[in-house]
UniProtKB/Swiss-Prot annotation:
Catalysed transformations (reactions): 2 glutathione + H2O2 = glutathione disulfide + 2 H2O
Organism name: Arabidopsis thaliana
Pfam families named among the record's database cross-references: GSHPx
Name of the protein described by the UniProt record: Probable glutathione peroxidase 4
Function (record text): May constitute a glutathione peroxidase-like protective system against oxidative stresses.
Length: 170
């Protein structure tokens, strides 16, 4: 879903995504905010570190126009096997996530969510645009453009300086 069939999206604000209960959410509500968009999974070896640090970052910067947007994904060894609602409950109950956890998406392939097609095209890696694993992170500026992309091994707290810089930029 996006702006129109003939006009390619130019920012994340032009997309519509679904929340964990399946309701449409227009991403334009995030205009003027710095976003960290992450594909998450509850049964991954990187789950504990990432969710813990995402919650810490969110608590620290949520009052400074910062949002974390978590998109559960079951494409990597089926490590998010439950429903979207179960993924939401897992994040909120176990890790006290106060940020949005959306409907499960595909991040790679023909049926990848349109927002993920945009994110990957905006910041491909030297190995191509394909997302390699859970907890790939995209830092998005207040203008809705992708600032940077971080792989699984990059912890949320290690990109705090980039988040601060994005928050300071007009």
């Amino acid at each position: 879903m996006g702006a129109s069939a003939s006009v390619p999206e130019r920012s994340v604000h032009q997309f519509t995504v679904k929340d964990s209960s399946g309701k449409d959410l227009n991403m334009s509500i995030y205009q003027g905010k710095v976003l960290l968009i992450v594909n998450v999974a509850s049964k991954c070896g990187f789950t504990e570190t990432n969710y813990t640090q995402l919650t810490e970052l969110y608590r620290k910067y949520k009052d400074q126009d910062f949002e974390i947007l978590a998109f559960p994904c079951n494409q990597f060894l089926y490590q998010e096997p439950g429903t979207s609602q179960e993924a939401h409950e897992f994040a909120c109950e176990r890790f006290k996530a106060e940020y949005p956890v959306f409907q499960k998406v595909r991040v790679n392939g023909q049926n990848a969510a349109p927002i993920y097609k945009f994110l990957k095209a905006s910041k491909p890696t030297f190995l191509g645009s394909r997302i390699k694993w859970n907890f790939t992170k995209f830092l998005v500026g207040k203008d809705g453009l992708v600032i940077d992309r971080y792989g699984t091994m990059v912890t949320p707290l290690s990109i705090e300086k980039d988040i601060k810089k994005a928050l300071e930029d007009a």
